[in-house]
């Protein structure tokens, strides 16, 4: 795919997919491309306010979780040689938020990222779209789409005034619908897709990108084997919209394959990819059925709880960061440097699983 414009607007949802980890991983590479003027990033004042609000929430939730862990895992203090000294620092939400804000502002206040105000957007245009059911107001929860509608209208005005198209990066289906209906907008589903597109269309990186892809194909069996090994030793968490509260008793990885690759960064010695794996696995569950159980107030226990075990086949997708090396630009030096999945705990969707007889 050819790069059609360097003008880019990234929705809050796309930043959240990357856990708002500004200055790290994919968002660090985004910042590097902006600094190199490979991307001209637009951010509306609405998105900026949303992110700052979410950073505050993330900081508070993370510190609360850390404090709970410190309390529950306090016994690890006796094994600092194994557990490390960094498990029990005394941190505050304010300190975490200040650092997160500093890194966010390094991206948006760098003299290159352009802040777009919504103050000149005509509210009548937005309300006409709302009452007519036009995107992004064409689904349920329409009122929640007002911030997105104002942001997109402001970005559209910038694109039209400069006679340019603009990439709209969002995993929000409503934003995608707006982009599809606007000749100035080109929708991309993720920041990873954007970085892959920029890297592969950069003259300085084009040959390196092609070479890195060939090295990756050479390493594909090793990558899949490593992913399978990690998943075989991983912890899985089932979830369902039903009333069941199952516990996993066993997981068997049946197959692992690579579904999608996005080139995040490449040099003469290594490359970083965002990899989506298709994973087929069989999981055995222990269920407790309380539907016909009776609560004994005196003994404070349920009687008549039914226990059963069932197995399900799952088709899941998990994303990981992959770094491969080829020192001195030689395929004979090809190696996998690291493979790190985005989450340490892997979700299993019981609602979409297939029951195994």
Regions found by a protein language model. Give the residues of each.
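Conserved SAM-binding loop
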Residues: 168
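Active-site-proximal, substrate-binding regions of enzyme catalytic domains
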Residues: 2-164, 173-226, 230-273, 278-280, ...
